């Protein structure tokens, strides 16, 4: 079928891991707090302040409910990057005189890896756990990495590039048994997969508003109260957020995050069914029409809104240019500006050639069946054309192992 026939509104948004569109119900909930309900939630002497404070506390309880936390355990931040920094650096600063070791994973989000590298310069020892070819960590390797000096294990819930879901419950059990704090960057999983901080023994969890159809510039950090977890603040000031994060709270953004969490709580099952159906339709139709396409990351232990594919014999950059009617990404949005192959794919043992051909397709709440079908038609027709032009594809067809070729450097 010619993709130009039956085309939906173009371009089609398929980059839901980078950000999500604002749910109209979220926008509606936020608007009054930009206009008539403009009070400072920390003003205690008049109704404008009380009104804002009530709205903030309601949002806090909505965020808490989605992960089975207590309302008082939610600290509002500017987003998951700040939450990750506060969790990792905050623990290191508070407990660093007693212990000096942190464990994380090679495939974590860049802000976690960079926070850890920063701490290495301050004398903290960091262990970067490898991942298996399916993108998931090995629990025995984690057990063996923990020492009596380990203060924190930081493992994300859902990987932003390949969508795999790490075994949080098992990791939490290991950490609790060994007396080590467990932090998880749950930005890509919050509101999309069931996460219960008590069942999973999570001590700190980082949340982002704009990954769950909420506004940008707002996030949260869950900090366990029992047994109590202490973090040294990164920002000093008026002592807001139980002293962990000073600064006037942005009421409209917090109301938006709360509403997004409330919606996710009620429609998570429906969203999951929708995304799983579109994942199967997208993947099966592509596999039926073109060969040598590989799904990166475990097929079952993943959030299926993330479809990271490698197309053998074609450069990822040329695919993105060819399918410009689809808004997609080659890796995480923070690093897709660099032409280096993804460090996440490389850490799974995927060769440089195949890593360079990978594209991340993101589907979500507002993706339609028509958009998925259009995307499949467009991708298949363009990949066929690009492969006809590709000397690499010719070599693959002739059975030449690209890994064994010695490339000339200019």
Curated annotation (Swiss-Prot):
Positions carrying N6-(pyridoxal phosphate)lysine: 211
This protein's UniProt keywords: 2Fe-2S, Cytoplasm, Iron, Iron-sulfur, Metal-binding, Pyridoxal phosphate, Transferase
Chemical reaction(s) catalysed: (sulfur carrier)-H + L-cysteine = (sulfur carrier)-SH + L-alanine
InterPro entries, sorted: Aminotrans_V_dom, Aminotrans_V_PyrdxlP_BS, Cys_deSase_IscS, Cysteine_dSase, PyrdxlP-dep_Trfase, PyrdxlP-dep_Trfase_major, PyrdxlP-dep_Trfase_small
EC number: 2.8.1.7
GO molecular function: 2 iron, 2 sulfur cluster binding; cysteine desulfurase activity; metal ion binding; pyridoxal phosphate binding
Cofactor: pyridoxal 5'-phosphate
Pathway: Cofactor biosynthesis; iron-sulfur cluster biosynthesis
Binding-site residues for [2Fe-2S] cluster, renumbered to this chain: 334
Enzyme class: transferase
Record-annotated active site: 334 (cysteine persulfide intermediate)
Gene Ontology annotations of biological process type: [2Fe-2S] cluster assembly
Subcellular compartments: Cytoplasm
Pfam families in alphabetical order: Aminotran_5
GO CC annotation terms, alphabetical: L-cysteine desulfurase complex
Residues that hold pyridoxal 5'-phosphate according to the record: 80-81, 160, 188, 208-210, 248
Assembly with partners or alone: Homodimer. Forms a heterotetramer with IscU, interacts with other sulfur acceptors.
Family in the record: Belongs to the class-V pyridoxal-phosphate-dependent aminotransferase family. NifS/IscS subfamily.
Free-text function comment from the UniProt entry: Master enzyme that delivers sulfur to a number of partners involved in Fe-S cluster assembly, tRNA modification or cofactor biosynthesis. Catalyzes the removal of elemental sulfur atoms from cysteine to produce alanine. Functions as a sulfur delivery protein for Fe-S cluster synthesis onto IscU, an Fe-S scaffold assembly protein, as well as other S acceptor proteins.
HAMAP family for the chain: Cys_desulf_IscS (MF_00331)
Protein name listed in UniProt: Cysteine desulfurase IscS
Taxon lineage: Bacteria, Pseudomonadati, Pseudomonadota, Alphaproteobacteria, Rickettsiales
